[in-house]
Structures are given as structure tokens and as C-alpha cells.
Amino acid sequence: MRTTLFLIFIGIMIAFSACRSDFNFESSTGNLGFSRDTVYLDTVFTDIGSSTYTLKVYNKSDNNISIPKVQLAKGAASKYRMTVDGMTGLDGDNSGIGDGKIFDNVELLAKDSLFIFIETTANIADANPTDFLYTDQIQFGSGSNLQKVELVTLIRDAYFIFPKRNEGIYEGVDFGFDENENVTQVRGRNLEAEHPVNGNEFEWNDDKPYVVYGYAAVPTDKTLNINAGARVHFHAESGMIVQDGATLNINGLKSDTEALEKEVIFEGDRLEPFYSDVPGQWGFVYLRQGSSATIDHLTLKNASVGLYVLNNTGTIKIKNTQIYDCSNVGIFAIAANITGFNVAINTAGQATFAGTVGGNYDFTHCTFNNNWASSSQVAVLLNDYLEENDVEVASNTLNANFKNCIIYGSTSVSLLFDNSRSDFNTIFDHCLIKFNDSGTTLAGNELYNFIRDEQNGNIKNQNPKFFDIQNNNLNIDETSAAKGKGKFSFSDGTLDLNGFPRIIEPSDIGAYNFSVIPED
């Protein structure tokens, strides 16, 4: 039986070999087609690898061809690397694996195509000093049959903040306490006043971006100032921790609404346009118990949680701030003290603002909108207790004031209360709130009478007419139900989030004055 199977196998192999020999390949004459003549790799930070980009190569002729050489023009010195139809090319550095620079005799059947995948890791020093572009070519063939596809990448220099590693173990920073009151840590490092590469890490400016790996921690008794125009990019599972007794000051300034040149921006480190509104790319900014913060003109986007505020004794002051596309919560507060003015938060997995286990919260002229694709999300959640295994383990008084605010979203109820105490104190004054409790467990709950009966100048279930929710534009147009429905005493002498004065009485509800939608 074994002899028979062996003979069958040999016969198949001989037949296959005989068929394969019928494929005759002639040298390419330079008539290849390409899916594009230039491959633009989006902006990358110095020494950080890019995403992978694709080029498709077509043989439109009726003949099988062999391309004598596919190579990068800069050869082994190129900062680009390729795979060609799964091949890694010649092993120029004797590593045992092709280095993705040079490929000999690449075969391509008639009327067929192949894929080339391209990546780069380049240093700012490799780029053109006038425009910071790093370029090369993919060359196909040679001599009179030579064809080229250009490669272009913009390189950005940056300050890099990352934990040290010793024998495979990363440096860590204090994060909290476990159930036995032991200190827990996460991967990261403390900022330094005299870092050997970055200099004073307690003053972040706009000369070049900051890229954070792990958690950048502001130590006790230290202050981090992030000044106008600064750009901060966080890698996956990275963020910032402000320790007990430390201070965070974000000092952005009014900017052009498109250029945002003086705005401070926190976002992920993937610079390709595709990632500009992808939630959950990095961790959070964690303001620990005993920390303090003043935040002005910050745009924070694509985090898991934007601001995570734990039981702070001082007041966290937030104004003129936008928080977008968080996969969990925009601002997650636990027994915290927060004041907010001109804050706009759009779309989060669970809530745009969650004030939990009590605390003191005061928001004026803020817009909370949640259009996350989930039936359980809300715009604002207020809660005064914590349960573990169905046992209440903590509770605190809640004091929450919302004045001239929009609380809206795609679900029928955008405001949710969850209380166990009688000192659950809320005031909503001249707010636009989406609240349709018909058929829900909230029907008849007296805590919601203020909006159910539209008391205290509040209005319910009317459309604020945001400009463009999908693109995080929460400006309101001239037909908005929020136009002229605010209480002017909360507005007098102030500017809206765009920097326009609130001078018309009655004022508009939310972070923005009404405006006319610009024509395309």
C-alpha cells in the first residue's frame, strides 16, 4: 500500500513539474501598469515605523514576463522596505531574511498582477532639510525599460517620553492601590526637570510635538505647564498621570477654528487621516486624589477615557475645551470637584460625562452629545454610590449644577440618575435636554420632574440642530431650539467656545452661539 501511494505521489509531482515547465517567461520590456505613480506614506514621527501601504503592479500583456530587477533606488541605504508578492528580497545584511530592498527576476503571469507592500522607518536627519520630506523610488527593470514609482513621506521630529527598560523589565509609576492597600504601578516614568535629551520636561511648548509611551507622570509637588500650540501624541495604552499634590496647567489660547494653532491638542500617535476619529487609541489623563488642574483651550480626542478624575480635594477647572470620540467616557469623575465652562464633549461609548460616587460638579454653557452606536449610552450620568458584588461599599453627597447646557444624543434618554441617598442634589437651569421616558423604568421617577414638566426654563426633546455630529462640529444653526433660550445672567460678559461675545439677550444654550452653516 505504501509503495502504491509513493508511486502515485511521484507521478503527481512529475505531472506538475511537466505542466510548470510550460510557463515561459520573457524579460519585461517596460510596459508594466501601476495602481498609482506615487505612493504617499502619511506623516510619521522620527524613528517610528509607518503603517503599511500598497502598490499593485499589472502585466497587461499576453505574455508571461520576468522583471529582471525590482529595487529601491537608494538600495541598501534606503529607509523604505518592501515585500513583493510575499517575498522579502535579497539578504543584503546576511541576517537570514531578505531586507526588502532588492528583488531579482520577479515573475508575473500574463494578464495578472502582484502586490508590493511598503513601509518606512526614518529619522528627521534623513529628510530634506527644507521640507522634511524623505523620498525614494521603486525601480522596475533597467536601461531603456526602466519604470519608476515615487515614494514620499513627511518626517516630523518630536520629544519622546518613554519608560526605561532594564533586563526586560520596564520602569513604572504609581497608579493606585490594590485591595490590600499595596501600591500598584503601570508602565511609565516620572517627568524630570533636567532630562538629558528633552531638557525641562515640566514645560511643554510648541517647538515640536511630544510623543508619550506608557504613562508620563507629574510627580508630587511638581507642576506641568503645557503651553499654547503644544501637540501631545499618546501611543496605545499610554497616557498621563498627575500624582497627589501635583498640578497640571494646560494653557491653550483662542485660535482659528480650523488651524487651531494656539490650541493644545491631545491625541493618538497614528497620524494617518484614517485614524483622526477612531476611538480608544490611547488611555487617559488621570488626575489622582490630591491633584489639581486648570485646563483651557484643550482638544482631546480618540482616548479610552478623556479625563479620569479621582476624589480630588481641589477643584479641577476646565474651560474652552473639546473632548471627542472616547471609547468609554469623555470625563469620568469619582467623588470629584469639577467646574466646566464652554466644554463640548461628543460621542463616547458609555457617557460623555459621568459624575459618580457623589462629588461637586458645576457646568455652565456646556454641550454634551452622545451618538455612540449603543442603546445603553447616555450623554450625562450622575451617581452617588459604588457597589461591589451587589454590596454598597461607598457613597457620597452629590451636588450637580448645569446651567445653559445642552444634554442630547441618539437614545431616547440622554440624562440618567442613579442614586442611593437622599442628598442627591441636582439643579438644571435653562438647559436643553433629550428626555423621553415613555415606556422606560424612569417613568414616574420624581427626580426627573424638572425636565418632564420643563421647569426652571428647561426644554425637552427639541433639536439643537448641530452642524455636523459625525465630524465633531457641535455648533448650532439659526433654527436650533437652543437659540435664544438661555439665561443671560449666566452669559453676560462671556465669550462662546469660538471666541464670540455673548451679547444678545436671551443668550443661546450650549457652548456655542448660533451661527449660519457655511456653504461648501
Please identify what each model-predicted range represents.
Residues 476-477:
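Polyanionic/metal-chelating signatures
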Residues 1-6:
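Positively charged n-region of N-terminal signal peptides that target proteins for export
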Residues 20-40, 60-119, 124-126:
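Surface-exposed binding patches on compact interaction domains or structured appendages
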Residues 15-18:
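C-terminal motif of bacterial Sec signal peptides marking the signal peptidase cleavage site
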Residues 25, 35-43, 48-49, 56, ...:
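Beta-strand/loop edge motif enriched in small/polar residues
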